[in-house]
Every structure is written in C-alpha cells, then in structure tokens.
Amino acid sequence: MIEKNERRWLLLFGLVVVLITSIPYLIGFATQGEEWVFSGFIIGVEDGNSYLAKMFSGYSGDWLFKTPYTNFPQEGLLTYLPYLILGKLTSPPAQQEQMIALFHLFRVFSGLLMVGASYAFISLFIKKIVLRRWATALAVLGGGLGWLLIVLGKSDLFGSLPLEFYSPESFGFLSLFSLPHLALARALLLWGLLWYLKEIPQASKSSLWQKDKVGIKIGLLWLFMGFFQPLYIVVGIGLITAHLLALSILAWRKTISWNQCIAFSRRLIWIAIVSAPMLVYNLIIFSTDPFAKAWTAQNTIASPHIFHYLLAYILLLPFAFMGLKRFYSTDRIRASFFLAWGLVLPFWVYAPVSVQRRLAEGFWVALVISAIYYLDAQKEKPLWFQ
C-alpha cells in the first residue's frame, strides 16, 4: 500500500529525474546558432531522426508505418503508431520544432510513468519506505560495472561496448533518457506483473476456462502495450509461463496445491487470449509481408558476450541470491516468480532470434528487488540507509 506521503515523494523524485535528464537537451537548444541547428537528440541520433520521419509520415496522413528510407514496395505496418499520432498534432510553420517538442513531452510523460510503475512494483515486495526509494532510484537510474571497462581503456572488449551505454532493456536509464516508447512499455509491463502477483488467485476446482478478471485486465493492458513494443507481450507471457512451471514443481513437491496451479493457469490463459490480437497480427505480418521480413532481417539486436552481462549484474547478484533465499522462506509463490525469471534469462538473451537483447527487459528491476529484499528483511537498517 502506497501512502500519501510516498506519492508526494514519488512525484517529486520523478519530476527531478525528468528535469535532470532534460538538461542536456536544453543546453543543446540554447547553444545552437546560425551555422548549425540542434537535432533534438543527444544519443541514438539516427534513431531519433527516424522517429521524426515517422511523425512526418503521420502528419502526411499515414496511420501505418512506411519507412521513407527505401523504395521497396510497402503495404504499411501497424507499428510506431504513437509517433504517427504525435505527427498529426503538428502543422507548419516551425513543424520540426513542434515535433521535437512533442517527442520530449512524450519522453517526460513516459519517464514519469516508468518511475511510478517501478515504485509501485517494488512496493509490493519491499516494506521499508526508505528502501523502496533507494530501490526505485537504482531501478531507473542505476547500472553495473561496465564503466570500469571505459576507465581501463577496454571499451570494445569482446566486440561491444558495456551494456550500460547502449542497451535500454538491460537497465532502464537509456529508455528514460531517450526512448519514450520503451519507457512507457516498461511501465505497462511492470503494472501488469504487479496485478498478476498482487492478487494471488484462490485455489479452487473451478474450470480452467472460468473467467479471471485480473487476467482480462492484464491482457487489455498488455494489448495496449503492444502499440509501443509488442515484443514485451512475449516477455510478459513468457515470464508468467516460466512462473507456472516453477509452481508446478512446487505442487509436485506438495508445497502448494495443484488447484493453485490451475488458478494461475486460468489467469495466464485469459492474459494470452486478450492480448493475442497484437501477437497474432505481428506473427502473420512479419512472416508473410516481404517488406516486414526484410526489415526484420536487418533489425538485429544481438546480445553481447556473456562477460558483459556478468559485469552488468555481478554487483547485485550475491545480494539477490541471499534476498531470494529469505523471500522463498516467507512467500514461495511470489519468490518463485523471481527465481524463474533469473533461470530463464540466460536462455532468452541467447535464443536463436534476432532480438535477443530485448528479452532482458525488466530483469534489472527484478534483480534490484531481490537484492534490496535482503536488506528489507534485516531487523536493523544498515547505517547508510538510515
């Protein structure tokens, strides 16, 4: 339960975060001159300009995405819809400036939602308010030890930069800083997982197809999430499926009842049914449309060498292990969700797909919760959290 004073702190923290992350952009606009014009982007400039191109397409009347960077025949894809809609809110003169301003308003809005969703999800498991705040700050702003490679002059170790510098899904800050559609998608993913774990379904002998209101609500939320990043629906359903497998093991060991597993299965079924239209559309279009297939072939988001993931997460892993051990002793159903997430992650990020790295979405938040839970379970707060 989030109290009123927590909401005030959360709003203030969110505003401070989006203000600080806006400073580099404000400096860019303030220092442009007659000889050069600030593009509106600090990192990922090519991606940023592509978002502006999508907004121009929206202004021109398009409701489906067609890239302007090729003359390959295109029917249009139901993707990047938020940017197409933003473009429809602009008009000459100074249209590019309007688009850049709308992009950053979208970034601020998405950043606030991401901060709020992270805090809400964390609060379900962490009871001490001061630790909730530290965990939220770490979840949205934190990183691993990748910076050490930069200091040591090994920035291209194993052929890639440290994950902190280019992978928004591995942590979170880059989404908040420059990729609003991913920040908003993470917020929706976390809210769905929050609803899934907050209301534990009651064990019963009811039919597997009995309506589950929570499952329907999550399905609708994730269906909407699909307009921002459809792959996160796969992540969410995949996580719940992994959790169900973990619960089945618990039931087999007679730690929980099989009826409890059936109740969770019912919830998963309704989530999948309601969010399925977006998944089915993408599956069909990206396997049959020639342009979509060609676009997917070049859209490679591969995971780096495993050393980079170890360097990214090694600092929290020991605390997360101890935290999960304590968590499991008090709440096996919820703890098994985080345990399942950690076990499937290595297989996901090296699965034979072109978007490996995207499948790490949200894991950083789970790792932070598991690590902070160890501190939360202590009877005395550490001095540095007083």
Question: What kind of region is each of these model predictions?
Answer:
Residues 1-5, 198-216, 245-266, 322-333, ...:
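Membrane-interface junctions at the ends of membrane-embedded or membrane-associated helices
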Residues 21-190, 194-197, 230-234:
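Active-site lumenal/periplasmic loops and adjacent helix-entry segments of GT-C-fold
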Residues 47, 221-332, 353-355, 359:
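Transmembrane catalytic cores of multi-pass membrane glycosyltransferases
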Residues 112, 183-194, 318, 361, ...:
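Alpha-helical transmembrane segments of multi-pass membrane proteins
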Residues 115, 119, 123, 190-201, ...:
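Hydrophobic transmembrane alpha-helices
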Residues 166-167, 186, 190-191, 195-223, ...:
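Short hydrophobic alpha-helices at membrane interfaces in multi-pass membrane enzymes
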Residues 234-235, 355-380:
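Hydrophobic/aromatic-rich transmembrane helices and adjacent perimembrane loops
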Residues 343-356:
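Transmembrane-helix signature of polytopic, lipid-linked glycan biosynthesis machinery
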